[in-house]
């Protein structure tokens, strides 16, 4: 079954009908059970991760990857954080097309004000799998940075979620950590997100 799907990760993101189609010995009932089990596991992982502080872009990737990297349309969301960088809630901002999504800074910042968030992380996926930022991504990041300063809300990062490749299991781009390394503020024992 895993071999037919290509990988366990690919299998986990298939609909029940797709699972039944790739394996002749599995009917719709068993395929639906498998699909439900994968979804339950993904939800349990997100719940566990949501209790821990989000300190690095890798933490963002770990939290969002099961929900975002297999989406076929660009999806923009914000992770609202408290003063200890724990997740208050994720908020979906927009769903776009295969290669773009429209998000305005006011739509991105509105949930931070409504939910009284200390800060936020902007995130979106690239359905192509390549997390390299586009010029549009660069411009949006700069506009959101400027607007968040005016509102006094901490814009902690913009993370683009890609898909795993042959050379890396965690494929993402972070505007604050372009190399993906865990950076610390100069002279302090805390991560950049704090």
Regions found by a protein language model. Give the residues of each.
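Long, highly charged, low-complexity intrinsically disordered interaction regions
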Residues: 1-22
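Histidine/lysine/aspartate-rich catalytic loop segments that bind and position anionic ligands
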Residues: 58-115, 119
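Short acidic, glycine-rich surface-loop motifs adjacent to enzyme active sites
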Residues: 118-131
């Amino acid at each position: 079954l895993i071999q037919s799907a290509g990988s366990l990760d690919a299998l986990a993101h298939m609909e029940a009908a797709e699972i039944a189609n790739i394996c002749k010995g599995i009917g719709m009932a068993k395929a639906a059970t498998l699909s439900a089990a994968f979804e339950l596991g993904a939800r349990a992982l997100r719940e566990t991760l949501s209790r821990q502080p989000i300190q690095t872009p890798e933490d963002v990737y770990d939290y969002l990857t099961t929900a975002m990297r297999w989406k076929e349309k660009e999806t923009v969301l914000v992770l609202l954080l408290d003063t200890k960088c724990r997740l208050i809630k994720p908020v979906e901002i927009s769903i776009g097309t295969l290669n773009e999504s429209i998000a305005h800074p006011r739509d991105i910042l509105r949930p931070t004000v409504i939910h009284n968030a200390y800060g936020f992380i902007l995130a979106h996926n690239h359905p192509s799998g390549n997390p390299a930022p586009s010029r549009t991504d660069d411009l949006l990041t700069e506009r959101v940075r400027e607007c968040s300063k005016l509102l006094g809300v901490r814009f902690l990062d913009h993370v683009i979620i890609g898909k795993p490749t042959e050379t890396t299991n965690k494929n993402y781009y972070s505007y604050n950590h372009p190399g993906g390394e865990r950076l610390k503020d100069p002279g302090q024992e805390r991560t950049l997100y704090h």
